Every structure is written in C-alpha cells, then in structure tokens.
Amino acid sequence: MSNVSMRDMLKAGVHFGHKTRYWNPKMKQFIFGARDKVHIINLEQTVPMFNEALAFVNNVSSKKGKVLFVGTKRAASDAIKDAAIKSDQFYVNHRWLGGMLTNWKTVRQSIKRLKDLESQSTDGTFEALTKKEALMRTREMEKLDKSLGGIKNMGGLPDVLFIIDADHEHIAIKEANNLGIPVISVVDTNSNPDGVDYVVPGNDDAIRAVTLYCDAVANSVLSGREQNIVVQAEKDGFVEAE
C-alpha cells in the first residue's frame, strides 16, 4: 500500500496554509504556527492522518468498493479526473449538481439520457436529423457529459468520497453525511472540517500538493484492487507454479 512521507509533503508545499486573517478557528489544532502572515500546517499530524485515510481507501477497494473523487475548482479539476481514470474509479470535476447523491434516482435518468445520446451519435441517428436538431442534441450530450461523464458508469452510490477543498465542496459533504457515506477531505486552514470523517489538514490550492493527494489515493485504490484479485485467486484455488 502506498504511504506518503513528510518529505513528499514538504516538497509539494502541503504545509502552506492560507493567510492568517482568513483562518477558521476549527483548524487551530492542526496549525503549527505562522510565517509572513501565512499559517503553517503541522505535517506531523497531516502525515499519519493522510496515511490512515489511504489505508481506509485501500480497505474499501479490496472489497470492490467505489471511490468518488470530487474537486470542482480549477486547481483540482485535472488532477481529480486523472486520478479517477488511472484507478478506474469515478469523478466530479466541474460542478456538483445539488442532489447528485441524495436524488440519485433523478441523476440516474439523466445518465440514461446521456448514454442514449452517445449511442445516437455513433449509430447514425444524428446523421439522419436536420443540422439544427443534430447540433441541439450534440450540445445536450456535451453538457450532460461535462456534469455526469465521470459518474455515468458508477451504477449506484459510491462507498467513499475523496474531496479536495472541504469548503468548496460543502454540498457534496452534506449529501454524503445524510446518506452515511464516509468522507475523506483535504481541509486547508481557512476551511471547516465538520462533516469530514477523515480530515487531511493541508494546502488545497497548490497544483503539486493536489496532485500528490490524488495520486496517493489512486495508488491506494489500485493496491486494494490487487489484494482483492489475490484473495479471489486463492479462493478459486489458483496457485502460481513454482
């Protein structure tokens, strides 16, 4: 299983929080001090807390659980998508639509519409339409794909949410809390950790830091999946030849 070291975090700038005047007092216990009016996060807490979260992801994945990566702000969007694709998981990286989890029945209908449009775009249906109608359907498909493309094959609610920026994604956290879905989130010094089951105190704006978190979670998913394959092979009686 992948672990992240203090050195990895220092190199990525995980310890740099926000300006002191923007702090959230609920993050006080995770702050080491301040330098040039910027809060410094105590990585001696972040390292074990993040590694505990990674162990949880590993465990969920070893049981074929689904991980939903969420990060809709610009600094997180690409890394969230890349990590989810790398680990064959699911993502929301543009806008969190209210009810994405709590109103799954309606979301499922929109996903069905997206898949229908995708089929139409390849089976010749679009070619048979007027230019205007084909353009309208293409635009509808692109809009749906932007919102739902990352979860279209999720096939039900996720088993855990991994989030970059707890404040920015507070609606997702609230929905997960309502449904009893565990939440792992990077929480910066200006954010509220309430509702987060696995708090990862750290910078949520620096691309290198965000990429570090996302890659580590993706690697934990992959190692969990490998464990599942080994266990299944043992159950089925497959033994490697000497």
Swiss-Prot record:
Q: Which domain of life is it from?
A: Bacteria
Q: One MF term in GO for this entry?
A: structural constituent of ribosome
- Record carries keyword Ribonucleoprotein: yes
GO CC, one annotated term: cytosolic small ribosomal subunit
Tell me, what is an example of a GO biological process annotation in this record? translation
Disulfide cysteine pairs (residue numbers): none
Q: Does the keyword DNA-binding apply?
A: no
Pfam families given in the database record: Ribosomal_S2
| Gene3D superfamilies in the record | Glucose-6-phosphate isomerase like protein, domain 1 (3.40.50.10490), Helix hairpin bin (1.10.287.610)
- Cited PROSITE patterns: RIBOSOMAL_S2_1 (PS00962), RIBOSOMAL_S2_2 (PS00963)
Query: Could you tell me the keywords of this UniProt record?
Result: Ribonucleoprotein, Ribosomal protein
NCBIfam families in alphabetical order:
rpsB_bact
What's this protein's family per the entry?
Answer: Belongs to the universal ribosomal protein uS2 family.
Please report the name of this protein according to its UniProt entry. Small ribosomal subunit protein uS2
- Recorded source organism is Colwellia psychrerythraea (strain 34H / ATCC BAA-681)
The gene behind this protein is rpsB
